[in-house]
Amino acid sequence: MRTITATLLACLAFSIDAADYRANEVANGFQIPWGIEFLDKQQMIVNEKNGTVSLLNIASGKQQTLFKVPNVNTSGQAGLLDVALVPNTAPQNPQVFFTYSKRTDKGNTVALATAQLKNNQLVGWKDVFVADAITDTSRHYGSRIAFVDDKVYFSIGDRGERDNGQDTQTHAGTILRLNLDGSVPQDNPFKTSEARPEIWSYGHRNPQGMFYDEATKQLWSIEHGPRGGDEINLIRKGANYGWAKVSQGKEYWGPLDVGEAKSLPNMEDPKLVYIPSIAPSNMVVYRGDKYPELDGKILAGALKLAHINVVSIENGKLTESKRLMENLGERVRDITISPDGYVYFSTDTGKIFRLEEK
C-alpha cells in the first residue's frame, strides 16, 4: 500500500502571472464542445454535446457539420463525448473513434463508435462496443479515449451508482481495453475470470480525463471525486482504484467521509488528490518546446474553478504547481495538443482557445 501524494488546495498561491500566458480565441459558437481532436495542423474535429460532429479550420475559423450522431442521449451529463484519431491512420481517410451516451430499449449507456473521414464527410459510422452500464440516472458517463500499442482504451463512470465501482460484472466504473475491431485482447487481465473481460481497471467514479504519455509509456487518468477527492491516477493492468470503498471526499449532504477509509490494501492510491475539488475534465502530458516551463507537466482542465491545472511530476510524485487562465472565467472542457506543439482547449461556452506565451 503506497502513501498518497495529496495536495490540500484552499486558495493557495499557485496562480501564474497573467502576463506569462494568454488565451487566443480561435473559434466560438459550438454547443458545449466536449471533445476536440486535430486531424492536422489546420483542421480539428469538434464533438458537440448535442450530438453534432463538426470540422473546424483553425486558420479561417470556418465550421462545417460532418455528422449528426443517431440515438444520442443529451440529458444531464449525457451527450456526444470524446473523439480520438487512430494513431498512424491513413491521412487521406483517417479513422476516428468516438464515445457517446447511447439510447437503448433498456435505458442509456456508453458506446464506443468509429467512422472514417472522406472528402470532408464522416462515413461508415458504426458502434464498435456498447457497454453494459445502464442505469436510470443521467450522470457519470465518463468518458475519454486513449490508444496504446494498437489497442483502444476508454473510460466509463459509475453511472451514478456507487456499488458499480467494485462490481466487475458491469462496465460502469471502469476503464476498458479493446482491439480496434471491438474484440477482447487475449492479454486483458480478466479474460479468463468471471469479471467482464473488457475491463482493464476498475474502482473508478467518473473519469473524464485520460492520456497516454508516449515518452514514459504511462497511462494517466483524472476523475471526479464526490465533495472533494478528485484524483489523478496512474493506470495499471487489472488494478482496483477503490471507489466507493476508498475516497478522499465527503458526502454532499454532510461532513461525513465517503467510503470505508482513505486507503485500503490491494487498492491503488491516487498519485494526486484535490481537496477541495476542481471538477476535472480532460488532461494531457505536455511534451514540446512551445512552452518550455510546461514541458513534462500534466495540464488538466478544471470545470468548477475554471482554469488549467498544471501538475509537476518529480520522481514519480505529483504536485500541483500552477493554475493558468483563472482570469478567463471559462469552464475548461477539453484540452489537446496540436501537431505543431500548441495547447488548445475548449470551454462550455462554446469557445476554442489556443494557449500562447506573451
Over which residues does each language-model region extend?
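Short, conserved clusters of charged catalytic residues that mark active-site
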Residues: N28-Q31, Y202, N327
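Repeated scaffold domains used in trafficking and secretory/extracellular systems
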Residues: V332-D334
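Hydrophobic h-region of N-terminal signal peptides that target proteins for export
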Residues: L9-D17
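Acidic, Gly/Ser/Thr-rich repeat motifs that build Ca2+-stabilized beta-propeller blades
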Residues: I16-E161, Y212, Q218-G225, P276-E314, ...
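Short, solvent-exposed aromatic-acidic interface loops
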Residues: K102, V130-A133, K191-E194, G249, ...
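Short, flexible active-site loop motifs that bind/organize anionic cofactors or intermediates
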Residues: V26, P197, M325
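Beta-propeller domain segments
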Residues: A78-L80, N88-A90, D158-K322, E330, ...
